[in-house]
Amino acid sequence: IIRGDSGIDIETVSVSIQNSLCFGLLDGTRQIGFARLVTDFATFGYLCDVYVLNDYQKSGLGRWLIECCHAHPLMSRLRRIMLVTDSAPWLYQKMGYLPLNRPDFVWQINRPDMYRKTEGK
């Protein structure tokens, strides 16, 4: 599933998937959800790209998808699992995630328009 508004090209999506532990959510043979874990496979994981198609939202499938991610044997050995999101904070809190509201603790370089094509190119 590639969100059309992301601006990310298919090659970048492919490389990101190849270098992640991925989880798919299917309705028959149709993919309706996705999540991936970027990890060192020992101590740290970054849960990202958690997505359920609009027609399937509000049915508990997003929570179930995250539960499936958490049930993977690798997850039990990770000391820290992080995610960055601006949607459904109530869901992630129910799943054991806590907001990091400590100053000078988490830092980032954020380039939100990295994959957007500029006009004229």
Give a label for each model feature.
Residues V38, I66-C69:
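Active-site-proximal cofactor/substrate-binding loop regions of enzyme domains
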Residues R63, R77-R111:
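Conserved active-site alpha-helix within GNAT-family acetyltransferase domains
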